[in-house]
């Protein structure tokens, strides 16, 4: 008997259920970092300053259901917006699926573990600064959120050896 392919391999973003759409978010928090755009050149610059609602440890929104009331410029991603905007990180699952690619090994839908996005060094955990603690955004410009990361695989012990024996 053939196993059914996962939804992200068989459906377009516009065909996803609400649950499928929400599960595509890997919880990296990169989209919740402030971005700057040069008014003359339109060049985009990423910062490591996070929205005040982002829990920089879990990399999840602390007020997801009410975020638009608390942060009026928070964006509600839609399939149309994913296709239009240029500031989603290249590692964003919405972008990856839109481009017909498979999700990476560290994505929780592939790994079965929401911690792999952090273990692989994809998330903003340990790298983001809360906007309430930051100074001028121009002082926090970084390039890493705009690059596809080279994820590090979690260390695995050799077969037959336990972590205690290492």
Swiss-Prot record:
InterPro entries: Puta_zinc/iron-chelating_dom (IPR005358), UCP006173 (IPR008228). Residues 147-166 are annotated as: Disordered. Residues 154-166 have a biased composition (Basic and acidic residues). Belongs to the UPF0260 family. HAMAP family: UPF0260 (MF_00676). This is UPF0260 protein GbCGDNIH1_2046. It comes from Granulibacter bethesdensis (strain ATCC BAA-1260 / CGDNIH1). The lineage of its organism: Bacteria, Pseudomonadati, Pseudomonadota, Alphaproteobacteria, Acetobacterales.
């Amino acid at each position: 008997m053939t196993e059914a392919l996962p939804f992200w391999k068989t459906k377009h973003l516009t065909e996803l259920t609400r649950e499928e759409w929400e599960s595509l978010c890997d919880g990296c928090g990169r989209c919740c970092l402030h971005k700057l755009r040069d008014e003359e050149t339109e060049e985009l610059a990423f910062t490591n300053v996070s929205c005040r609602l982002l829990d920089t440890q879990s990399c999840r929104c602390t007020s997801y259901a009410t975020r638009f009331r608390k942060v009026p410029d928070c964006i509600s991603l839609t399939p149309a917006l994913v296709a239009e905007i240029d500031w989603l990180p290249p590692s964003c699952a919405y972008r990856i699926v839109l481009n017909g690619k498979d999700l990476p090994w560290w994505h929780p839908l592939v790994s079965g573990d929401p911690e792999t996005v952090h273990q692989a060094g994809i998330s903003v955990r340990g790298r983001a600064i809360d906007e309430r603690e930051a100074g001028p955004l121009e002082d926090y410009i970084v390039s890493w959120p705009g690059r596809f990361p080279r994820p590090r695989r979690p260390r695995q012990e050799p077969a037959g050896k336990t972590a205690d024996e290492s």
